[in-house]
Swiss-Prot record:
GO terms for biological process: translation. It comes from Borrelia hermsii (strain HS1 / DAH). Disulfide bonds: none annotated. It comes from the Bacteria. One of its GO terms (molecular function) is structural constituent of ribosome. NCBIfam families: L28. One of its GO terms (cellular component) is ribosome. Belongs to the bacterial ribosomal protein bL28 family. This is Large ribosomal subunit protein bL28. Coiled coil: none annotated. PANTHER family: 39S RIBOSOMAL PROTEIN L28, MITOCHONDRIAL (PTHR13528), LARGE RIBOSOMAL SUBUNIT PROTEIN BL28M (PTHR13528:SF2).
Length: 92
């Protein structure tokens, strides 16, 4: 499956490195000059986490993003899965 969160579907994104030099006009400068833009990747912060599911009495290993882990710790795994239209059975 590669670098992808199994719950939210977050994956590697692509963008540009934009080097800037000079002081912004707001700060009293002559304005910023943008140099040559080069391609780069924004990788997802993935974590392999083991969750215990009390309804099934089993533990499940899930590859999730750090932001999904924070949300799960706030609302719980079953509520977060329902919110993202996933079922617990998909991970067994």
């Amino acid at each position: 499956m590669g670098r992808e969160c199994e719950i939210t579907g977050k994956r590697t994104m692509f963008g540009n490195n934009v080097p800037r030099k000079g002081l912004a006009k707001k700060k009293g400068g002559a304005g910023q000059h943008i140099g040559v833009k080069t391609k780069r990747t924004f990788k997802v912060n993935l974590i392999n986490k083991k969750f215990f599911i009390p309804e099934l009495g089993k533990s499940v290993n899930i590859k999730i993003s750090a932001s999904a882990l924070r949300s799960i710790s706030k609302v719980g795994l079953s509520v977060f899965l329902k919110k993202n239209c996933k079922k617990i059975e998909d991970f067994i």
